[in-house]
Amino acid sequence: MSINDKALSDVERIKAESQGLRGTLRESLHNPVTGALAEDDVQVIKFHGIYQQDYRDLRAERHQQKLEPLYQFMARLRLPGGVLSGAQWLALGDIARTYGNASLRITSRQSIQFHGLLKPHLRPVLQALDRALLDTVSACGDVNRNVIASSAPQISAFHAEAYGWAQKIAEHLLPQSHAYHEIWLGGQQITAPEEDLLYGSTYLPRKFKIAIAVPPHNDVDVLTQDLGFIAIHEEGRLAGFNVCVGGGLGRSHNKPDTYSRLADVCGFCAPGQVLAIAEAVLITQRDHGDRSNRSHARLKYTVDRMGLDRFMEEVQQRTGFSLAPPRPFHFETSGDRFGWLENDDGTACLTLFIPGGRVADGDIPLLSGLDALARLHHGEIRLTCNQNLLIAGISPAERPVVETVLAEYGLNRLLNLAPVRAHAMACVALPTCPLAMAEAERYLPVFLDRIEALLAEVGLEGEALTVRMTGCPNGCARPYLAEIGLVGKAPGLYDLYLGGDRTGMRLNALYREALDEEALLDALRPLLKRFAGQRWAGETFGDFVRRQDLLPPDPGLPHTGRR
């Protein structure tokens, strides 16, 4: 029996019956009785870049009042490479203030999310995005997601190449349905059947993620992707890419047959072969991925079930060529470099830390300050995969003006932070994510206060630990790569993972389960004390934990990636 001779999941039925991702969205959007969509349409709208959520802080209160949940929607941009113009940034701020919760959320995949949207506002939001030459097509759903690329290599031409390939891949793998334009933008309704030669009528078994890394920076965490391309530069030019297949971090609590996996580096391709490889890997996953069990539907499980050699044989049969042996590469960091950096073209770029990736006006008027910068600067605004923001192409004449705006709005406070805070990351979690089991974005600053105090207590003040926190085990903030990873298990309780590195090349491992804040600190204190007294020169905490063999034995999963 093949993997897909089993009974298909209900999501497969919904996709097959959706009439090219249309479903009954028109009817759902016009239904005034509820703030929600019809049940099947909740799945269909994901392919349009939108998730239905509810405001969970009010769920119990509204239930007591016999009201339906406060349904809201999250819309996510399709933004290959994470690049915006100043005018586009200003448009996003206007949309957030008019229709959302007056904030923009930078994601770990170089995109922007709007939270707090109500059903009647969805069409005006997407039309406003269209006027800004932006959209949300395929930002969610069982398709190729936002293609990410290294945001700030020191050589400007290398960034331009990586960004260019992110755009090309994104366009090449875009679904062909006209449903988005019909439903949201008033496009002509198509009654004849549509054929999508790439995706078919049921699209992919699950989401599909692609990244382009430019060594020595691995800000995209390229080995966590379904498909990764590592740029290889030789003699000052782009020679091609190492191809990485089968990464993915999401897992489920208490399901040991779900696991994190780092991608295998399978070979090297020339630039002109990139699109063919991307298409072939996607189609092979389309045809062989598990459509009966969505917990096993990602590419990493397909690769492990088929075997890497057989999987790549099929990919190469589809492309008509074989990959060359992989070429040497080296990553030095996966974090962002904050402050001013000089580019090779005479301009400068400025990287700002964005607390929790949340751009809003609070103690620091961040949204207003960035709007002011966008009005005066005509270069690019780049989003990083660490949920931060980079202003690129600042001329020597502009720099004093930019520094004046930084001081006026207090944004210069985002340039000099404790390293453990600057390199931390959290997913959104509560109160909007329906999957969250615990806090993340709202709790991380509190936990970092305690971690900073603990580091000072043991003589490690200023240590650049990587701390990542998620509200559930799906891994959106990539906690399974961190030196200290916290994964929500229940309200106030987290599984503690230790032993990742600072380059995105090694998974961490489970150390303790279901710990509250005090138990987390009690677990970390003796380890950090030991690290302070016994570390080698230049050794990181993650490397120390591994060298000292402080982690439990591997649980013996089929394949949990390179350790």
From Swiss-Prot:
Its cofactor is siroheme; [4Fe-4S] cluster. Its EC number is 1.8.1.2. GO terms for cellular component: sulfite reductase complex (NADPH). It catalyses: hydrogen sulfide + 3 NADP(+) + 3 H2O = sulfite + 3 NADPH + 4 H(+). The keyword Flavoprotein does not apply. The keyword Plastid does not apply. Keywords: 4Fe-4S, Amino-acid biosynthesis, Cysteine biosynthesis, Heme, Iron, Iron-sulfur, Metal-binding, NADP, Oxidoreductase. HAMAP family: CysI. Component of the sulfite reductase complex that catalyzes the 6-electron reduction of sulfite to sulfide. This is one of several activities required for the biosynthesis of L-cysteine from sulfate. NCBIfam families: PRK13504.1 (NF010029). Belongs to the nitrite and sulfite reductase 4Fe-4S domain family. This is Sulfite reductase [NADPH] hemoprotein beta-component. It comes from Acidithiobacillus ferrooxidans (strain ATCC 23270 / DSM 14882 / CIP 104768 / NCIMB 8455). The gene is cysI.
